[in-house]
Amino acid sequence: MSAIERFDVVVVGSGIVGLGAALAAVDRGCSVLVIDRASEIAGASVRNFGHLCFTPQSGLARDYAMASREIWLRLAHDAGFWIDDAGTLVVARHDDELQLLRELAAQRLPRSPGAAVEVELLTADEIETLAALPAGTAVGGARLPLDLQVDPRFAAAAIRDHLLGRGVEFRMRTAAGRIASGRVDTSRGPVDAGTIVVAVNHDIDQLFPVMAERYGVVRCGLDMMRVTADLPRPLTGPLLTGWSLIRYSAFTSMAASSDVRDRLTAERPELAALDLNQMYTQRPDGSLIVGDSHWKGESVSPFQPEDAARALLDEFESLFQHRADVVERWQGVYATAGEEFLIEEIEPDVLVTVVTTGIGMTTGLGLAEKVVGAHLDTHSRTLTESTML
Ligand SMILES: Cc1cc2nc3c(=O)[nH]c(=O)nc-3n(C[C@H](O)[C@H](O)[C@H](O)COP(=O)(O)OP(=O)(O)OC[C@H]3O[C@@H](n4cnc5c(N)ncnc54)[C@H](O)[C@@H]3O)c2cc1C
């Protein structure tokens, strides 16, 4: 009978949260196995905008976001993938949107000499130039200089390759079944582990359905597309619109946010019904990622109604005054719940780490460092003893 393999840390899920967990573990000298039931990294972590929106977060998300920022910069250097530090652009097309940006800028003033400016207010001319918009589109805007952008299709794979080089083992096409303290039963047999990290995004409702129901986790399906368009100049950063100002927590905590929400909902009920977040990122090849709509439920329909895609294209063409040619369409899914994170040690040394809203690229690496790293630090004596057995 062959002996059961043993690792200090087994991570279930090779998306950005799982990769972050593997990084936190290998940084602490652990032996690490990452398993994923897919043959490639193909979940939400490659289907997103690649927008690392640190500034509009608050509370725990802000802590994780700022920790993530350092890790993204380090990884981009160490793993050698493209990262852009030009910051996020926000176009205000109405006075209430500009008012919200002014409130945020006043709240995020640098507290000490030399501290970074987090929100730079822009004139209408400035935002139109930086975001390739026609004259007369904006009443003003802002730049959020701390924010970063990556190309998600390449970043996750580059991080995996970097981790491989540091001795982390990846076992793809391998599904986790029963998970209990010390052991993961996989579709290739059992594996023993000092610590198990479950980073399976919305599939948490399959692995731990009772816990997922307790947290009110459902799935959120998003329609996305990649387009080419003959814009007069490139975007100088991810571009958010008023629809984004009613989403991210630091924006929604501003007094003007309810004015923006009420007006947009009254003016464009059909877009509000799609739960639209009209935003854009431009990839290094010049094509633009366009999104997104949101549909929440226990399952996500495999059939994508064309009205969402039509609305995304219409809004693109009306904003930029340029035709968009669709290159690709896809659907993304993430877990969503009342709180932004589901973090629980469901059994001793079994950590569940799920970002339960659409900010996992922004916060996932920091979450992994703060939750998994802190757990390993606390349990380092046990770990060293078990590794030496
Ligand atoms: C369309 C879209 C746009 C988004 N835009 C942004 C953005 O711009 N900025 C931002 O911060 N966030 C964004 N997000 C959110 C972000 O992408 C996610 O929060 C993040 O990628 C989640 O990472 P993850 O590692 O938890 O999940 P995933 O990347 O989905 O990885 C989970 C992995 O678990 C594996 N798995 C599941 N069950 C099992 C099992 N039983 N056994 C083995 N493996 C299993 C899956 O195969 C998958 O590979 C967006 C999300 C979507 C869908």
Predicted stretch roles:
Residues V26-V46:
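Glycine-rich FAD pyrophosphate-binding loop
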Residues D275, P284-I289, W295-L389:
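C-terminal catalytic lobe of FAD-dependent flavoproteins
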Residues A142-A180, A193-G194:
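Helical element adjacent to the flavin cofactor pocket in flavoenzyme catalytic cores
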